[in-house]
Amino acid sequence: MILAGRAPSNTSTLMKFYSLLLYSLLFSFPFLYHPLPLPSYLHHTINLTHSLPAASNPSLANNCWLCISLSSSAYIAVPTLQTDRATSPVSLHLRTSFNSPHLYPPEELIYFLDRSSKTSPDISHQPAAALLHIYLKNLSPYINSTPPIFGPLTTQTTIPVAAPLCISRQRPTGIPLGNISPSRCSFTLHLQSPTTHVTETIGVFQLHIIDKPSINTDKLKNVSSNYCLGRHLPYISLHPWLPSPCSSDSPPRPSSCLLTPSPQNNSERLLVDTQRFLIHHENRTSSSMQLAHQSPLQPLTAAALAGSLGVWVQDTPFSTPSHPFSLHLQFCLTQGLFFLCGSSTYMCLPANWTGTCTLVFLTPKIQFANGTKELPVPLMTLTPQKRVIPLIPLMVGLGLSASTIALSTGIAGISTSVTTFRSPSNDFSASITDISQTLSVLQAQVDSLAAVVLQNRRGLGLSILLNEECCFYLNQSGLVYENIKKLKDRAQKLANQASNYAESPWALSNWMSWVLPILSPLIPIFLLLLFGPCIFHLVSQFIQNRIQAITNHSI
């Protein structure tokens, strides 16, 4: 970069001077170079990253560099398997807006854990009716004080391969979430917004419930399946779009299923049930047509149901038609799944959303390089250095299926509270024991951990500060077992020291119990004897000065 009014040579000299000054400060004040701590939520991610190569590509299990991006917004999206779209449940949140405070409690968020629970057998098949039944029958639903997380979790997420199935909902008005490129969607279900409402009367309440949308596509074709022929489903009465409850001994209801294209695997196919608006995953490898366990609330159902519902009081002689409250259906994914819409990821779909989304797992940006190559350590300079690092995306070396299976366990952190280091020695010993036991369990899943701990920590501090990649060297040296043994020995040593000190005559708890009653009356006397003469002298001097001043004034 050339500064205005200066020659390139002067600029180069100035940059060198600034660099030397910065290096001098770093060497003179080492605390300025102290590495930043690793975020706790990345602990399990790093350990899991070490186990990924051995699970899918043994050639990457050792003697290689794995680099993890520490940017909080840059993630890689891995498309979920076909079974995840049919078996992954979503949580239903009903947000109620009350206009009559004397009839209903204040606005609150109600979360249905299981609408098929025996504690509420009379709950209707429609969400709005279910909410009214809860209030009319004085049932106590689970109240979730924490609202769902709306808004994008990440904004720079990339998907390296095409997703097998996307869901698109386009409307002129709504909350835009983002659109995935058509080249990244093998097949897209287009949801058409409904134009009619279903009305149901319960007691004095009249419900206006949004009708189910339709699927606008010409690529789907009707197929014959056990689901399509009207298979009995135990949760059939819980679905919000069925006209009436259906018991197990009632005749099966015909339903039309549409087949989504799946050229990768002909033995498995994904079906869309337009009657119940569910996705079915069917395995055709056996003669019995194995059917995956279905969830009553699937991501497809959630995407179509995310809208607003209105409820009005029916006209009676004692009241006039009014609008006591409205219902807003909101859905959130569970089990570590996310909605990817464009380059942003979401856990929850807001009401009246618009865009093109798919289901993905999230993983940090991971790359690998040959262990024989030397990776330069980033230096803290005024100008960003252009580093040419031969990094290859991890998705190229690992299979997507193996990565998806491994990442489905979710991301969890192994963290130790700061208050542990302020606790007595016995609590500190117990925490070290817990850490050693945790590492022992993780060692069964991880082939090798980072051996060059000090070098990695120094590089890690700069990587977090500069928001760049952090590389860990993988080996099979057994360093973890040595550290575990040291931790256990240290915990035992601390426990013995704490026990010996507590039993010794110099322990504070042994002699303070009889010393304090003696010292409590002696301390005030000692303070009085120490400061009493000084205070008495000051008071006497003050009185003499005042008397002298009054005498002089009178004369």
UniProtKB/Swiss-Prot annotation:
Site entry: Cleavage: R387, V388
Places the protein is found: Virion
Gene3D superfamilies assigned: 1.10.287.210
Any one Gene Ontology cellular component term annotated for this protein: plasma membrane
Keywords, in A-Z order: Cell membrane, Cleavage on pair of basic residues, Disulfide bond, ERV, Glycoprotein, Membrane, Signal, Transmembrane, Transmembrane helix, Transposable element, Viral envelope protein, Virion
Additional free-text comment from the UniProt record: Orthologs in P.troglodytes, G.gorilla (truncated) and P.pygmaeus (truncated).
Identification of the protein by name: HERV-H_2q24.1 provirus ancestral Env polyprotein
Tissue and organ expression note: Low expression in testis.
Keyword DNA damage listed: no
Stretches assigned to coiled coil: none
Family assignment from sequence similarity: Belongs to the gamma type-C retroviral envelope protein family. HERV class-I H env subfamily.
Region (Fusion peptide): 388-408
Signal peptide: 1-35
Modifications the protein undergoes after translation, according to the UniProt entry: Specific enzymatic cleavages in vivo yield the mature SU and TM proteins.
Subunit relationships: The surface (SU) and transmembrane (TM) proteins form a heterodimer. SU and TM are attached by noncovalent interactions or by a labile interchain disulfide bond.
Extracellular side: 36-515
Annotated TM spans: 516-536
Glycan-bearing residues: N47, N222, N265, N283, N352, N370, N475
Task performed by this protein: Retroviral envelope proteins mediate receptor recognition and membrane fusion during early infection. Endogenous envelope proteins may have kept, lost or modified their original function during evolution. This endogenous envelope protein has lost its original fusogenic properties.
